[in-house]
Amino acid sequence: MISVCIATYNGAAFIEEQLKSILSQLSSVDEVVISDDGSTDGTTDIICRIKDERIRLLPSYESLGSTGNFFRAIDASKGDIIFLADQDDVWLSGRVERCLKELETADLVVTDCAVTDEGLNVVYPSLFRLYGLRQGLLHNLLRCGYYGSLMAMRRSVVERARPWPENELLKHDWWLGMVAEKTGRVRFVSDKQYVLYRRHEGTETQVSKSLFKRSNRSLKTKIMARLSMAREIRNKR
């Protein structure tokens, strides 16, 4: 069984398109678990209108934040294979099939994507090439290549990643990726792009060619996050 976990917050503009791109690749026994963080723009109404039994919308809570919202969705999931998805992207055909194939011999998979603008016009054809994303514990400690919207994993990764870190600097995708690097097998799939990674003014993660511009956090905060990650991941087995 596959569980696709989505954290939503005021995603009314794009959530329907994303859900359709995901549902078209799932079987009748799979699920999409959505945790909403108190949207006020009708996001949950749009989700309910789709009326697909595979969608499980959790009761809305406020102020969990992106990481807490994703952890909540993951905790509610039931699948042996877990995908993470953002509310504003689009999955391209063949993504689920390719990830399942790679997960036969890996614990966590990251697939490449094309970076687009709000209208899905391609801005960068490959996020991997733009940032030099690849596996490697030290590499991803210094420059995180774990984008949740590009990740799929075995449930065993989630079990090893618990308990979830209380430090807010350790984001859900970075934490899961680093745990998989430390305790299992990770694969970055670079030969094809399987997601349209939509960037617009409302997205939390921005795209820049600068090393420390993945987010708007200060350089000091980013250094503190890396030190915290090094301490937390050291004892994971």
Please provide the spans of the model-predicted regions.
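A conserved acidic beta->alpha catalytic loop
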Residues: S21, D36-D45, E62
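Short aromatic/hydrophobic "clamp" motif used to bind/position activated sugar donors
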Residues: I82
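Short beta-strand/loop segment that forms part of the nucleotide-sugar
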Residues: V29-G38, L58-S60
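Short, well-formed alpha-helical segments that are part of the catalytic scaffolds
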Residues: G11-S24
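Glycine-rich, basic loop-to-helix element that forms the pyrophosphate-binding segment
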Residues: S60-S77
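Acidic helix N-cap motif at the loop->helix transition within catalytic regions
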Residues: F14-E16, T40-R49, G94
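Conserved nucleotide-sugar donor-binding catalytic segment
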Residues: Q135-S208
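Conserved donor NDP-sugar-binding/catalytic core segment of glycosyltransferases
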Residues: V96-V123
